Amino acid sequence: MKLSFFSPKTRLLVISVLANLALLFACGWLFLQAKSSYTDYRYFRALGIGTSESTNLKYEASPAGETKVVLFGDSRVQNWIPAPEIDNTIFINAGINGETTTEMQRRFQHDVLRHQPDIVVMQAGVNDLTAAVTRGIEDPQELIDIMHSNMQYYIDALKDQNIQLVITSIFPNSTYSIPKRLFWHGSLSADIINSNRIIEGFAHSSGANYLDLSSVFYRDSSALNRDMFIDTLHINASAYSEINKALSELLPTLSQSQ
């Protein structure tokens, strides 16, 4: 009599179970490798290790009587279309997707100072903060501190050039997508709020202008308006329209004071 354990159906079942276990193990191993690579990638970018880009914008002299404004930052600036419509004001978009504040330093001369702007509007820092919340980063505070130091650098450098600076509050984040839940800790919102407080202090102590955009993204003091977002980090046309309104009120007053 043959044991049922060795029956064709049983052997097929055992093979199927072993194959699925092997597949599960392989998927787990690949996930850990991907997680490790992603962690290294985010850490190195936060430190500015790797390649850097520039916008390759051609220099154009401002017509007499016109104010030149450079929008400087990451994808949140790159997606900032259209810019505010202000009489006698031209805007140059110097935003590059994914950049940290350290990476932005490499192109600061080429993409900002070279244009000899009257005003610079900065929206930056979120990519440093998402690097800091990446699972596996050993010292998240190190990356946050570097970002704060970089923001002080921009404030000081533009002040030395007698260029007016408007630092906008770092836009908040919306709900994490499923992939981001796998790779990011949940402290991003708090880190953005804390960093905004610190950057606001830098701006006020150095004579720069800080534009708090909380009212664009919050229905009241705490309820985030998710209708202003297209994904976890990026905002939609309605949000940009509200930001443009705020800048349209602020920038002319800065132009008149020059």
Features from the language model and the residues they span:
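Generic detection of intrinsically disordered/low-complexity segments and helix-coil linkers/edges
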Residues: 23, 35-37, 53, 74, ...
